[in-house]
C-alpha cells in the first residue's frame, strides 16, 4: 500500500497515533537513513582497502593502524544501526512500530522523530539502563 505524504508533512499529536501517514513518514525516514549509512559504509570500506599500503616510518604506521581501527569501529557501529533500522522497518510492516516493546505504550512522536529506531518509551529505557548498570557493576 502506497501512502502519499503532503509536502513538508510532519507527524502531529493531533492525528491518530501510527496512522498510515505516520507509518509512511517513518518508513521513508528509516529507508533514507539506511541508504545514507550504506553509502558511508562503502566509503569506509574503500578507505580501508586503500590503507593497505606499507608505511615505512614507525610513527606513520602507528597512526595508520589507529586510523584503521577507528574506521573498523565506525563500520561496526554502522552495521549495528543498519540492523536496528531493518528491525524498525519490520515493525512498521507488522504494526508494532512506535509502541514500547516493554510496556506496549506509544513511544511518542517526538522521540521517534529524534530516534526513529527507538523501541521503548523514555521511562522504560531509563529503567532498562538502570537495570543494566546494576547488573554490569557486579
Task: Please name every model-derived segment.
Residues 1-94, 131-132, 137-138:
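Interaction interfaces in information-processing and related assembly proteins
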Residues 97, 118:
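Residues immediately within or flanking Cys/His clusters that coordinate Zn2+
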Residues 100-103, 121:
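Short cysteine-rich clusters marking metal-coordination/redox-active sites
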Residues 107-108, 129:
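Short functional micro-motifs and their immediate structural scaffolds
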Residues 110-114:
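Short Cys/His-rich "knuckle" micro-motifs
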Residues 121, 126-131:
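Membrane-interface alpha-helices
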Amino acid at each position: 500500500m502506497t501512502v502519499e505524504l503532503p509536502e513538508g508533512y510532519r507527524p502531529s499529536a493531533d492525528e491518530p497515533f501510527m496512522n498510515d501517514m505516520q507509518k509512511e513518514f517513518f518508513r521513508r525516514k528509516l529507508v533514507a537513513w539506511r541508504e545514507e549509512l550504506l553509502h558511508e559504509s562503502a566509503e569506509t570500506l574503500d578507505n580501508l582497502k586503500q590503507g593497505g599500503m606499507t608505511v615505512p616510518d614507525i610513527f606513520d604506521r602507528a597512526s595508520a593502524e589507529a586510523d584503521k581501527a577507528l574506521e573498523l569501529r565506525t563500520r561496526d557501529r554502522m552495521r549495528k544501526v543498519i540492523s536496528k533500522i531493518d528491525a524498525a522497518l519490520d515493525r512498521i510492516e507488522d504494526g508494532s512500530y512506535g509502541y514500547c516493546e516493554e510496556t506496549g505504550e506509544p513511544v511518542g512522536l517526538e522521540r521517534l522523530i529524534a530516534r526513529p529506531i527507538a523501541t521503548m518509551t523514555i521511562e522504560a529505557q531509563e529503567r532498562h539502563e538502570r537495570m543494566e548498570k546494576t547488573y554490569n557493576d557486579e
